[in-house]
């Protein structure tokens, strides 16, 4: 189960997702932070706000994020059958649930209305025809999912695994999208007041990793 959970973390870090292209295209190029001077049209489309559903970066990100959802669903569905303590199984399921919630949140805030898939795939075409859910419905769904497993998450002891503080930070962000300012402040304050996190120096922020200011980072290895 832990190996499968590591697979969900791996999918989050995919090149088409948090590993690079999703944020190159979805955030930076579509804003005025950077501009594109190369020859690849799928980057240029974002820089000029002329992208379509056929854009390669968009399709890569779509598949990569739903691959993360699928892997998390596999963990959630199969973990109850493993030979381990209930505490360990519940924590694994909780981590996978938060990972799935982040992926569904990213899909909704990027594309708007999306199909919400919360079951592992067992047959080809199983989810053909699944209706889209409105973005606000998706946001509330993932909030409910996170809160349902919150108490099974561990406390903050490292910066590369999902824990209660990671869930707090994600909840704060989702509540911002719902314009629920009170709950956004509530969960953000929980992170701010956690002594495990504090501001770091500008040099560490730029050149370092896993600094005291980092709530959650995806781990990479050269192996």
Regions found by a protein language model. Give the residues of each.
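Acidic, glycine-rich segments characteristic of secretory precursors and extracytoplasmic regions
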Residues: 1-25
